Amino acid sequence: MDTKQAVLDILNELTGEDLSDQMDENIFENGLLDSMATVQMLLELQDKCDVTAPVSEFHREDWDTPNKIIAKVESLRNE
C-alpha cells in the first residue's frame, strides 16, 4: 500500500471522514482529531508505514493536513 492510501485509511478510521478530496484540510482546527486520536494516528503510522514518529517530536503544524502527514511519513522513510 502506498503512503497516501495508508495515511488516508488511517485518517478515515480515526475521523470517520473521507479526506481524499480535502488533502489540505486542517484536521486539528476542524476538530477531526484530538490529542488521543493524534497519539493513535502516530502509532498506526508507525505500524502501517514502518516509520518511527515519536510523540515527543510531534509538532502539530507539521502534521495538520493529510498532505503534510503524507510528506512527513515519506520524509521519515528516507531518513
From Swiss-Prot:
The modification O-(pantetheine 4'-phosphoryl)serine is found at S35. Belongs to the DltC family. Carrier protein involved in the D-alanylation of lipoteichoic acid (LTA). The loading of thioester-linked D-alanine onto DltC is catalyzed by D-alanine--D-alanyl carrier protein ligase DltA. The DltC-carried D-alanyl group is further transferred to cell membrane phosphatidylglycerol (PG) by forming an ester bond, probably catalyzed by DltD. D-alanylation of LTA plays an important role in modulating the properties of the cell wall in Gram-positive bacteria, influencing the net charge of the cell wall. 4'-phosphopantetheine is transferred from CoA to a specific serine of apo-DCP. InterPro entries: ACP-like_sf, DltC, PP-bd_ACP. One of its GO terms (biological process) is cell wall organization. It is found in: Cytoplasm. GO terms for molecular function: D-alanyl carrier activity. The keyword Magnesium does not apply. Pathway: Cell wall biogenesis; lipoteichoic acid biosynthesis. It holds the Pfam family PP-binding. Its main location: cytoplasm. The keyword Phosphoprotein applies. Transmembrane segments: none annotated. Keywords: Cell wall biogenesis/degradation, Cytoplasm, Phosphopantetheine, Phosphoprotein. It comes from Lactobacillus johnsonii (strain CNCM I-12250 / La1 / NCC 533). GO terms for cellular component: cytoplasm. Residues 1-77 form the Carrier domain. This is D-alanyl carrier protein.
